[in-house]
């Protein structure tokens, strides 16, 4: 614990230094690098940045996208999420690059709003909605229609059996309220009783009234977060009656008092190079299971980065104290030097195998299941692109089913010096395994892949493959991305295929879980968008959600649809980006690209995010863009 406290103190010191550098650039305003006696920013950009940003691929923003941001924002990025790519640059060199690229406001530095910089200063911002009036009611975990955590249960089926509305009600859904908040990506809504909990990349964690959107409290975390919240009743004598758990994007798991938002504990659980935690934690019988992922795929585009020392992992903590109980890596082999890259920098392996999604609990077998992503180097990684089973009590790996071997991938190949000798297709398993019980009592593990494949595995036979169905050709940004949903008969599959080398098949597909047979298909149509970039696309990357008779799915073009589970007929459709919303704060906000965290259903209402990572602006990747960052609450007739 002392070590964790010391690390947090170091992190706070570093954050103050970084923020000081950012504020310095804000103060400099429209000054040039030459006036400030800085190095040649143009030359530094060509040498360190141009290879990727002048020829962008996949998730890399183009130079003109970066240039729309202020020098202060670019400086914050180089000292934050882009720090690995900026490794080796002095502060003066970073300032020179930022001033070379960044937009300078006509009115001088006073027009640069430091609070608009992507990061954790949410504490300095006004509350994002009206404060709830009156006495705060107690948390009620007894309600049958709650949506708690990522998958609405430890099996991660993303199915709401008690939605509080029927399939016949769905065509009458209308917007009841909208909530707009800072941060380029946001966590999925958790709804328990009248309480809605949600996280954001601004560092703010909110407790809202689920029916009205008013704010009970806002906790200003020290780091961005995009995981879903899990609400738990603590044992008698604990410092709070109820706690919420989440992980931040950097290195910590956090517990807050669900009633007040006060921090109960915070534990550093990983400090590997380039760690970025996106998957949501899962709670079970006093233990919190937190997945570990990274940004090494992008960081390795920096030719000076020692690629790669990161291994995906699952961490189990005591939910009451935050004490780490065990930690299991997706490969048991520690990364070791194996060759030099094209520029003579040391390379390491095995590396990779991030866990991007929430773990799945199997109490019957005493196991926890995780799905893993690609490897980064050509050193064999037995736990990449796989489903892994670990013992709940010890973390011991019971079995691994690797569906794609040697999928060695980083962004920017073949240009980047750190590229594997043979580059893989990046067919990660980025969604949670679904533990499904058939009517005859047998259980299957069902999981999707960015290859467009869906797999059913046998938990009684070490994950042996039962069936595989290739729904689409897939790609780095294709196939199954954030999550599927399952009811008693079918699994509902959202297909992205926003970028494919063959004919993509974006849309929603239903497969019979018993044998993988096709039930129905909805090839999503192309529709115009407010924004003009590659993310004006019918891709269904956002996680899908089901209730009796209905499956909900959002697409990147902003369309939110409800389908009949029996035949795929569209029951209801709403364009979340067609018109601005008047938010609960009385301000105007826009919807946009739908991606990442999926819809949640509880108490007769449906909640969904519209807007993702600045992709709804004319230049995808402008994280300061104000368009597309809203939580929308729907109810029957808007009542």
UniProtKB/Swiss-Prot annotation:
GO cellular component: cytoplasm
InterPro entries, per the entry: Cyt_c-like_dom_sf (IPR036909), PQQ_b-propeller_rpt (IPR018391), PQQ_rpt_dom (IPR002372), Quinoprotein_ADH-like_sf (IPR011047)
Catalyzed chemical reaction(s): a polyvinyl alcohol + 2n Fe(III)-[cytochrome c] = an oxidized polyvinyl alcohol + 2n Fe(II)-[cytochrome c] + 2n H(+)
SUPFAM superfamilies in the cross-refs: Cytochrome c, Quinoprotein alcohol dehydrogenase-like
Top-level taxonomic group: Bacteria
Co-factor(s): pyrroloquinoline quinone
Major subcellular site: cytoplasm
Keywords noted in UniProt: Cytoplasm, Heme, Iron, Metal-binding, Oxidoreductase, Signal
One of the Pfam families matching this protein, by short name: PQQ_2
Location within or outside the cell: Cytoplasm
Domain Cytochrome c residue range list: 36-152
Gene Ontology MF terms in the entry: electron transfer activity; heme binding; metal ion binding; polyvinyl alcohol dehydrogenase (cytochrome) activity
Cleaved signal peptide residues: 1-33
Residues that hold heme according to the record: 49, 52-53
EC number(s) per entry: 1.1.2.6
PANTHER family named in the record: OUTER MEMBRANE PROTEIN ASSEMBLY FACTOR BAMB, QUINOPROTEIN ALCOHOL DEHYDROGENASE (CYTOCHROME C)
UniProt subunit comment: Monomer.
Reported function: Catalyzes the oxidation of polyvinyl alcohol (PVA) in the polyvinyl alcohol degradation pathway.
Family under the similarity heading: Belongs to the bacterial PQQ dehydrogenase family.
Entry protein name: Polyvinylalcohol dehydrogenase
């Amino acid at each position: 614990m002392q070590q964790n406290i010391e690390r947090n103190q170091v992190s706070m010191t570093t954050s103050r230094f970084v923020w000081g550098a950012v504020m310095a650039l804000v103060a400099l305003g429209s000054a040039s690098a030459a006036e400030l006696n800085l190095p040649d920013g143009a030359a530094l950009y060509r040498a360190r940045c141009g290879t990727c940003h002048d020829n962008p691929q996949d998730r890399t923003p183009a130079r003109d996208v970066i240039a729309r941001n202020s020098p202060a924002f670019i400086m914050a990025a180089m000292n934050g999420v882009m720090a690995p790519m900026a490794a080796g640059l002095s502060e003066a060199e970073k300032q020179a690059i930022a001033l070379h690229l960044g937009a300078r406001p006509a009115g001088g530095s006073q027009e640069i709003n430091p609070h608009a910089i992507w990061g954790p200063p949410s504490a300095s911002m006004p509350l994002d909605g009206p404060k709830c009036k009156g006495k705060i009611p107690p948390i009620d975990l007894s309600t049958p229609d709650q949506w708690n955590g990522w998958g609405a249960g430890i099996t991660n089926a993303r199915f709401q059996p008690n939605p509080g509305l029927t399939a016949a009600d769905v065509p009458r859904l209308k917007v009841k309220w909208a909530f707009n908040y800072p941060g380029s990506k946001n966590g999925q809504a958790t709804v328990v009783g009248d309480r809605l909990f949600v996280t954001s990349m601004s560092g703010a964690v909110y407790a809202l009234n689920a029916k009205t959107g008013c704010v009970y409290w806002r906790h200003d975390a020290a780091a961005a977060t995009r995981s879903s919240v899990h609400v738990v009743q603590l044992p008698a004598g604990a410092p709070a009656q109820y706690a919420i758990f989440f992980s931040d994007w950097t290195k910590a798991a956090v517990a807050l008092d669900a009633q007040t938002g006060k921090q109960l504990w915070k534990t550093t659980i990983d400090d590997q190079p380039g760690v970025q935690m996106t998957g949501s934690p899962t709670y079970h019988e006093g233990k919190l299971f937190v997945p570990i992922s990274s940004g090494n795929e992008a960081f390795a585009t920096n030719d000076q980065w020692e690629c790669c020392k990161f291994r995906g992992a699952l961490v189990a903590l005591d939910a009451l104290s935050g004490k780490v109980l065990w930690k299991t890596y997706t490969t048991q082999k520690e990364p070791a030097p194996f060759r030099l890259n094209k520029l003579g920098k040391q390379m390491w392996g095995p590396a990779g195998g991030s866990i991007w999604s929430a773990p799945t609990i199997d109490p019957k077998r005493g196991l926890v299941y995780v799905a893993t992503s690609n490897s980064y180097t050509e050193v064999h990684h037995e736990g990449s692109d796989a489903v892994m089973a670990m013992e709940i009590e010890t973390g011991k790996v019971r079995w691994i089913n690797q569906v794609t071997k040697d999928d060695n991938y980083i962004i920017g190949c073949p240009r980047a010096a750190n590229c594997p000798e043979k580059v893989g297709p990046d067919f990660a398993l980025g969604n949670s395994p679904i533990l499904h019980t058939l009517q005859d009592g047998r259980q299957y593990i069902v999981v999707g892949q960015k290859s467009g494949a869906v797999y059913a595995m046998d938990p009684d036979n070490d994950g042996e493959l039962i069936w595989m169905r290739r729904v689409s050709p897939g790609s780095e940004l294709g196939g199954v991305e954030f999550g599927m949903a399952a009811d008693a008969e079918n699994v509902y599959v959202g297909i992205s295929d926003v970028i494919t080398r063959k004919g993509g098949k974006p849309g929603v597909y239903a497969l019979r879980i018993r044998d993988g047979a096709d039930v129905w298909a909805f090839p999503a149509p192309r529709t115009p968008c407010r924004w003009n970039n590659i993310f004006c696309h019918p891709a269904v990357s956002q996680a899908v959600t089901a209730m009796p008779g209905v499956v909900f799915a959002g697409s990147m073009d902003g369309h939110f649809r409800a389908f009949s589970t029996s035949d795929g007929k569209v029951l209801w459709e709403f364009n979340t980006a067609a018109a601005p919303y008047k938010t609960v704060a009385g301000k105007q906000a826009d919807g946009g690209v739908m991606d990442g965290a999926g819809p949640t259903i509880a108490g007769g209402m449906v909640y969904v995010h519209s807007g993702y990572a600045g992709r709804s602006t004319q230049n995808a990747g402008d994280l300061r863009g104000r368009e597309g960052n809203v939580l929308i609450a729907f109810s029957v007739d808007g009542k």
